[in-house]
């Protein structure tokens, strides 16, 4: 009887541990590489950005570091920092009540000649770049709306300072946690 209870208890504990691992995102091929304010950035989000820059380097006839090398890890981690920045922008925009819709992003992509109709993919590097730019424009408009100045030059300078202060505060106050081996460095 005691052996049976022990076996049942072991099965229950084992199932709970397995469920916990699966619910936390472990046990699959898309590990979290960083968390921004609790929002995960996964390997499947990072890989296309790395691939984009690998292809850009190849198109320009420039070398790209080999996978697994120290130089590759430095480049990969800097690109992860870009994804962290974009996530911080999306979170800040949401707090301010501003957004960029998928339609707006695709229109901007098509207007810039970066994409053909139907070509813009939600997870593409170009899509993320345009989305971040639209969000930054809207964040800027929101946080600088009440600023006044005697000249256009002074107005631009005051707005730039206000936006810089806001973005510095966002970066300072947003909790970012990198998984081991992924933190950007010097």
Name the predicted role of every residue range.
Residues 20-21, 110, 132-137:
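A ubiquitous, low-specificity "background" feature that marks scattered single residues
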Residues 18-22, 92, 142:
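Hydrophobic membrane-targeting alpha-helices
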């Amino acid at each position: 009887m005691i052996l049976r209870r022990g076996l049942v208890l072991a099965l229950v504990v084992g199932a709970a541990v397995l469920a916990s691992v699966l619910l936390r995102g472990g046990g699959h091929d898309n590990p979290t590489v960083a968390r921004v304010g609790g929002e995960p950035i996964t390997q499947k989000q990072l890989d296309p950005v790395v691939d984009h820059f690998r292809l850009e380097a190849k198109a320009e006839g420039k070398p790209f570091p080999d996978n697994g090398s120290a130089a590759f890890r430095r480049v990969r981690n800097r690109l992860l920092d870009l994804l962290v920045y974009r996530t911080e922008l999306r979170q800040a925009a949401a707090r301010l009540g501003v957004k960029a819709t998928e339609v707006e992003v695709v229109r901007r992509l098509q207007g810039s000649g970066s994409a053909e109709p139907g070509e813009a993919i939600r997870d593409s590097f170009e899509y993320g770049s345009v989305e971040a730019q639209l969000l930054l424009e809207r964040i800027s408009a929101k946080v600088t709306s009440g600023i006044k100045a005697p000249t256009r030059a002074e107005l631009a300078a005051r707005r730039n300072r206000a936006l810089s202060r806001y973005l510095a505060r966002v970066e300072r106050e947003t909790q970012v946690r990198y998984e081991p081996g992924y933190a950007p460095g010097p």
